[in-house]
UniProtKB/Swiss-Prot annotation:
Its EC number is 1.1.-.-. Putative oxidoreductase. The gene is DHRS7B. CDD domains: 11beta-HSD1_like_SDR_c. It holds the Pfam family adh_short. Signal peptide: none annotated. This is Dehydrogenase/reductase SDR family member 7B. It is found in: Endoplasmic reticulum membrane. It is a single-pass type II membrane protein.
Length: 325
């Protein structure tokens, strides 16, 4: 009598014999090969989109901005690195200038030092940016600041500080560079927003408000500049493993100084930077780069708002309790 294990073994052998003796295996291998070739061609096309393009990156010296600089430099972009720290900008510029990418001509980045939160610095910075390579092909509004605190305890000055950095600064810089793009009938404006530009989490009010404003402004901009052949992409990442929470401001304006667990477990900034390059190459309009649960919350907010609000209230209670325990 043949045992069950033997029958399974025989059946498995017959299936493998069938696969290898027919066209199924070559067909499967062919499909895998075609898919791999498609992905390779797609990646090359995305890199070609920014090759020799003038790409401006704000907040370039740390976190996601720094990784975007590395990824776009390796793709052959001519970078204009922007930030507040001249020494850090020059250090990054030297690092990139010394690096090489196989099969790609790379370029020494230009640096422009200014504070995005200073309204008086924007016009001069925009002029300096345009002088670097003569024009701008891609503007990546990446610089930003995060916030942690209860609304009732938060100073209006903190709200203004977050809005100045996350909203008014990027808007002012975009407006300053936009006329040059319109004249050339060419350009791509990118806003690095957040999943919190689509949903609001408790104890993140100033940050969420600034990102909701960012989403709204750049959605309007997209519609208005379409006639000039200018692309606008809003990127909404979830948690990224950077120092964003460490450098966040609190209700009284002091530094938060804590690496949140969700941030520590967030996606690699390198991976997010690569996804941003891919989104630009595909000329996507609105992209959410988040894990399934945060992405689901965006739909839940629309489809089942009552449930979403209850979940947020529960989250607020838990967070409040953990702070007082």
């Amino acid at each position: 009598m043949v045992s069950a294990a033997t029958r399974k073994s025989l059946l498995r052998a017959r299936v493998m014999d069938f696969i290898t003796s027919t066209a199924i295996l070559p067909l499967l291998l062919g499909c895998v090969g075609l898919f791999s070739l498609f992905k390779l061609l797609q990646w090359l096309r995305m890199r070609a989109y920014v090759r020799n393009a003038v790409v401006v990156i704000t907040g370039a010296t740390s976190g996601l901005g720094r990784e975007c600089a590395r990824v776009f430099h390796a793709a052959g972009a001519r970078l204009v690195l922007c930030g507040r720290n001249a020494e850090a900008l020059e250090e990054l510029s030297q690092e990139l200038a010394a690096s090489r990418a196989p099969g790609v001509q790379t370029h020494k980045p230009c640096t422009v030092t200014f504070d995005l939160a200073d309204p008086g610095a924007i016009a001069g910075a925009a002029s300096e940016i345009l002088q670097c390579f003569g024009h701008v092909d891609v503007l990546i509004n990446n610089a930003g600041i995060s916030y942690r605190g209860a609304i009732v305890d938060t100073s209006p000055d903190v709200d203004k500080r977050v809005m100045e950095t996350n909203y008014f600064g990027p808007v002012a810089l975009t407006k300053a560079l936009l006329p040059a793009m319109i004249r050339r009938r060419q350009g791509h404006v990118v806003a690095i927003s957040s999943i919190q530009g689509k949903i609001s989490l408790p104890f993140r009010s100033a940050y969420a408000a600034s990102k909701h404003a960012t989403q709204a402004f750049f959605d309007c901009l997209r519609a208005e500049v379409e006639q000039h052949d200018i692309e606008v992409t809003v990127i909404s990442p979830g948690y990224i493993h950077t120092n964003l929470s460490l450098n966040a401001v609190t209700a009284d304006g002091s530094k938060y100084g804590v690496m949140d667990e969700t941030t520590a477990q967030g996606r690699s900034p390198v991976q997010v930077a690569q996804d941003i390059l891919a989104a630009l190459g595909k000329k996507k309009k609105d992209v959410v780069l988040a894990d399934p649960m945060p992405s689901l919350a965006v739909y839940l907010r629309t489809l089942a708002p009552g449930l979403f609000f209850r979940l947020m209230a529960s989250r607020a209670r838990k967070e409040r309790k953990s702070k007082h325990s």
